[in-house]
Structures are given as C-alpha cells and as structure tokens.
Regions:
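Helical "lid/coupling" subdomains associated with nucleotide-phosphate turnover
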Residues: 2-159
Length: 159
C-alpha cells in the first residue's frame, strides 16, 4: 500500500445528509452518489485511482452485503470472510433495498436489523467506490482496518 486517506463518506453521515424519505427517493440516492463520487475524486488523485487493482471491504456494510447476497441466517463469519461481492450483485441489492421501507429492511435475510437504517447508503458508497477505482468486485474481510495495518507493519519489518 502506497497511499491511504480517510474521508467523510461514512454511512451514518451520508444517511443523515441525504436519505430523508422512507423508502429513499431516487433524487436522494442520486445526490448521495454524486457526493461520494466528489469526495473520492477530491481525496484520491486520478493516477492512484487508475492504479488500483483490487479492493478489500471491511466493517458493517461490506460484511452485511456479503451476508445478504448469500442469504445467511444465521450470520456465518466463515462464509463472509473472503467472499467476493460483484458490482452487478450490489446494483441488484441496491435496487431491492432502496424500494423497501425501514421496517421491511429490518427483515431482510442476512441483514442485522440494526444495520437497516444505514444499509442503503452503505451500498451506494460501496458501489461508487468500486466505480471510482474501475473495479468489478470487492473481497470482504471479517477483520478490521487495524488488522490490515498490522499486517503491513509486520511485512515491512520482516522484509
């Protein structure tokens, strides 16, 4: 890894900023997608975006999407870790979830009910990140970003 950046594109912030209707309106989803694209374009130089060859998704949105895509009930971390989420599957998932009101999303197989309020924004963010980097899929990890940082430090120390 030669570049990293933190942005203000989290699911809670973006849900609060853009998704005020239940279910969210098309215009709200478009505004959210526009903002995420702008955040990434401003934060990540074009040459860096063009050089990315793979993505690993960590935390709630990625793991929730992997569980939804596999219709996991109960949740199984062994089946989530290493799962490859394709952009096409995420597009279908977004279309499905965005049509549901919050109460229906709370009952989606694979989705923890507490994630229902933010999952639509999360899928939009994940899709826009894939598009920004020209990727067709993301590999899901059950480990968090600190795990990845520790592995990087260990590799740098060993080599």
């Amino acid at each position: 890894m030669t570049f990293h950046v933190s942005t203000q594109a989290g699911v809670v912030r973006q849900t609060e900023r853009h998704l005020h209707s239940d279910p969210p309106r098309r215009e709200e989803l478009a505004a959210l997608a526009d903002e995420v694209r702008a955040i990434i374009a401003d934060a990540v130089p074009a040459d860096v975006r063009a050089s990315v060859v793979a993505a690993v998704g960590v935390a709630g949105t990625a793991t929730s999407c992997a569980a939804i895509d596999q219709e996991l009930d109960p949740y199984d971390p062994a089946r989530v870790h290493g799962y490859r989420l394709e952009a096409g599957a995420l597009e279908l998932m977004l279309a499905r979830l965005a049509e549901m009101d919050l109460e229906r999303r709370r009952h989606v197989t694979g989705l923890h009910p507490d994630r229902a309020p933010t999952i639509v924004a999360g899928v939009v963010i994940l899709l826009e990140a894939l598009r920004a980097f020209g990727l067709d899929e993301v590999e899901v990890s059950e480990h968090d970003i600190l795990w990845g940082a520790a592995l990087t430090v260990a590799a740098d120390t060993a080599g």
